[in-house]
Amino acid sequence: MAVQQNKKSPSKRGMHRAHDFLTAPSLAVEPTTGEVHLRHHISPNGFYRGKKVVKAKGE
């Protein structure tokens, strides 16, 4: 089991935890349909960056 060599000061502990907070997901709006989706993911209608890339289930 790992054992620390030296005690981490409260300041260093705070710096270590500085990026542990949650961030809201970055959302994008599809220009053709106007739907909101996660960035770098296709929209529910199968569009990505204005082009139809996947057929939707109902098509």
From Swiss-Prot:
SUPFAM superfamilies, per database record: Zn-binding ribosomal proteins
GO annotation, cellular component aspect: large ribosomal subunit
This protein's UniProt keywords: Ribonucleoprotein, Ribosomal protein
UniProt entry tagged with the keyword Ribosomal protein: yes
Signal sequence annotation: none
Segments for region (Disordered): 1-25
Name of one Pfam family that matches: Ribosomal_L32p
Molecular function GO labels: structural constituent of ribosome
Listed NCBIfam families: rpmF_bact
Family to which the UniProt record says this protein belongs: Belongs to the bacterial ribosomal protein bL32 family.
Listed name of the protein: Large ribosomal subunit protein bL32
Gene name, Swiss-Prot/TrEMBL: rpmF
